[in-house]
Amino acid sequence: MELSRSAAWSALVFHKHEVDKKTMRDMFAGDSDRFVKFSLSWKEMLLDYSKNRITSRTMELLLELAHSAGVDEKRQQMFQGAPINFTENRSVLHTALRRPPGYVLEVDGLNIGDEIAGVLFQMKNFCEKVISGKWKGYTGKSITDVVNIGIGGSDLGPYMVTEALKPFAHGGLDVHFVSNIDGTHIRETLKRLDPETTLFIIASKTFTTQETLTNAMSAREWFLARAVEEEYIKKHFAAVSTNQEKVVEFGIDDANMFRFWDWVGGRYSLWSSIGLSIALYLGFNRFEELLAGAHAMDEHFLNEPFNRNIPVILALLGIWYRNFFDAASHAVIPYDQYLHRFPAYLQQLDMESNGKRVDENGHTVTHATGPVIWGEPGTNAQHAFFQLLHQGPDLIPADFIVPLKSQNPSGEHHDMLLANCFAQTEALMKGKTEQEVRAELSDAGYDEADIQKLFQHKVFSGNRPTNTILVHELNPFMLGSLIAMYEHKVFVQGVIWRINSFDQWGVELGKQLARTILPEIQSAEAVTAHDASTNALINMARTFREENIRKESAQLSFF
């Protein structure tokens, strides 16, 4: 049966008409316990979901949907290592990466607990050598800078975490990230570094990823321009990969190759050896705290009943708006500058996971799936796109994330930040009525004619849903918990939508075509093999490239 024809779904369709008759402003006015009913506390985190277009009956029906969709069974399968990534026949065990040592879990005949412990031990020893200064470069100097070269999950997660946890860095190393194949990215990064004190981490599972290997070769050339001897590569390059042959061929000592596994998806890989740059920057003990925070959320997700389960509640609210209110996007607004890369990280996590149109049976879905995820830090966001949130025609649910403790207390700064965060969620919920606007304009001295012209522009409809996620402090443990919370939210939604949240075939077609187009751009012959638009674009690039080469040759011959 199609999801949209199920009893639980149909009940929600009918119930939505009842909810439409009420505003959140009225709901709060009629229930002094609304916050208590619709909030959850867990460790040093509070989820306030009372500013949503829901009633107790809404939550009952959404929870019924989750149970009828088999979320509990699928959750157990994931944690036990069943191949729930059914299009690639793989287990999904990023949760195993953050479990405390000493457990037994077999995948393909191997106890992955031992496998993970071995890689963590290797990472710890490596980090201790580099951080302590015992690891020396080719001239005998200690390492001062680490450059992580990767893309997608090999970049977004580590970059986000190192930015978010800057106050917890040990201070002995600077870390840099290169992902874009645009040569500007690596050139701008390298121009301020010293080859004698720089360590590169090449993060690529297959060691064949075009963008990563192109950047890695540029880094290698830059290094050898000063160091000359290829033997010195072993002192300045490490790899996170499964392809030992390619790693050694590059010149990296296989003792400095850190493995990970097929059951670790790229967007879930920061918990694995892909997190080596995190461990180097923060220190291995802080990396362990990050893992511990994620594991604590895993335990919460695995063991709490759905009505007290933060990831489940967030997932159900997302489905409520995506499927019953036609909300095509979801904003994430962290009121913490250190989390400025968090929305970008969640874009990949959510959109690569649930941006699917085919269900587990190979049929085109008849319901909406993953929304567009976007956002910026508050209060910058308020002066950029909050106009749309408040008065635009579309309903855009939003998550507000804010720590109560600032890592940089300075006068009233943090109090003002908190005030803005809380004010925005209240404003989105309450809005401002015509009566309130008219009274405000009248008090400001406007006459009736001017009020009549202006009042509609100053009315806020309100009834715009938000979640507020309060944490005591943004530290490694809590960041780990936040990331895992969103991972499990995405998982639950994928189960309900009956899609595979763990493959990403959508990234492949463009890469395949790029491999064909690259030699065509470099060819001397006009291209006609594509559609008219693509042919024209390639040929324009070809012509410009050829003319540029001729100009450069003419300038060289002149001198």
Swiss-Prot record:
Pathway: Carbohydrate biosynthesis; gluconeogenesis; Carbohydrate degradation; glycolysis; D-glyceraldehyde 3-phosphate and glycerone phosphate from D-glucose: step 2/4
Lineage of origin: Bacteria, Pseudomonadati, Chlorobiota, Chlorobiia, Chlorobiales
Catalytic residues as annotated in Swiss-Prot or TrEMBL: 352, 383, 511
Keywords attached to this entry: Cytoplasm, Gluconeogenesis, Glycolysis, Isomerase
InterPro entries: G6P_Isomerase, G6P_Isomerase_C, Phosphoglucose_isomerase_CS, SIS_dom_sf, SIS_PGI_1, SIS_PGI_2
One GO cellular component term: cytosol
This protein's name: Glucose-6-phosphate isomerase
Family: Belongs to the GPI family.
This protein's record includes keyword Cytoplasm: yes
NCBIfam families attached to this UniProt entry: PRK00179.1
Function field: Catalyzes the reversible isomerization of glucose-6-phosphate to fructose-6-phosphate.
